[in-house]
A protein has these predicted regions:
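Active-site loop immediately N-terminal to the catalytic Tyr-X3-Lys motif
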Residues: 147-153
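Active-site helix of classical SDR
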Residues: 122, 158
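Residue(s) in the substrate-gating loop at a strand-loop-helix junction
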Residues: 142
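Rossmann-fold cofactor-recognition segment
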Residues: 51-69
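Conserved mid-core segment of classical short-chain dehydrogenase/reductases
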Residues: 72, 86, 92-108, 151
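Conserved glycine-rich cofactor-binding loop
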Residues: 13-15
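C-terminal helical subdomain
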Residues: 182, 198-235
Length: 250
């Protein structure tokens, strides 16, 4: 009988997701399913993890991230082998705000991959977890979703959707065996933010952010700001009056 914790990571090739996987496997061998769009990249991640944790069962799934029916089938196939203990929904992209303003297709794509797609995956897993009355759904949002800002409001709008969705899902599952964790990273040193690092931005290490996520998911913490200082920063930004906020170049 397989008593290993069953973990699914959607968007497993993201730097944060990969480091979360490493930390989970360092704790104990697991039954790990890696979901991504690029088969070669997922296999590279899986190969590395198998070396790190030979006793773990690691499988890969190449999947569609935008088509609802394909997402439904992907999740149904994953849960056929048993109830999922943890699903981390980690995929997304960091679009250029100017591109989104000038190109409606780019705008739509940014909203879809950062907002709609994570919600669809979460809802598909929620259906199974509701029946089992067991499991944790962890969604990676962003501090950008806390208040719309001119520098990234399309991305922020998508992540704001994830935030509201997660809040509603938490309300739905309150008092049950299903936990919902909303993760709000600040700017983190990953390939997705390489252009920000080049501009001198202060970025959190991916290792520290992943550590906070894994610890928060284990305890079922409802909201994780990573690093924690972003809770205070975003509380201030959320509560700034418009006449002050509108003068800021952020």
């Amino acid at each position: 009988m397989n008593n290993k914790k069953k973990i699914v990571i959607v968007g497993a090739t993201s730097a944060i997701a990969e480091h979360c996987a490493r930390l989970w496997l360092e704790k104990q061998p697991a039954d790990l399913t890696l979901v991504g769009r690029d088969a070669q990249r997922i296999e590279r991640v899986a190969t590395d993890l198998k070396v790190r944790s030979p006793e773990s069962e690691i499988r890969t799934v190449q999947a569609e991230f935008l088509d609802p029916e394909a997402i439904k089938v992907t999740v149904e196939n994953i849960v056929q082998s048993g109830d999922v203990d943890v699903v981390l929904i980690a995929h997304g992209s960091l679009p250029d705000q100017a591109d989104c303003q000038d190109d409606l297709t780019a705008c739509r794509e940014a909203l879809d991959i950062n907002g709609i797609s994570p919600v669809l995956y979460a809802e598909a897993f929620a259906k199974r977890m509701a029946k089992a009355n067991h499991g944790t759904i962890a969604l990676i949002g962003s501090v950008a979703g806390d208040r719309g800002r001119k520098s990234n409001y399309v991305y922020g709008a998508a992540k704001g959707l994830v935030t509201r969705y997660a809040q509603g899902l938490q309300h739905r599952f309150a008092g049950t065996g299903v936990k919902v964790v909303l993760i709000k990273p600040g700017p983190t040193d990953t390939p997705m933010t390489a252009h920000l690092k080049g501009k001198g931005a202060k970025l959190a290490s991916v290792e520290s952010v992943a550590k906070q996520i894994v610890e928060g998911v284990e305890t079922g913490k409802p909201v994780i700001y990573a690093p924690g200082k972003w809770w205070l920063i975003m509380m201030v930004i959320r509560h700034l009056p418009a006449f002050v906020f509108n003068k800021m170049n952020i």
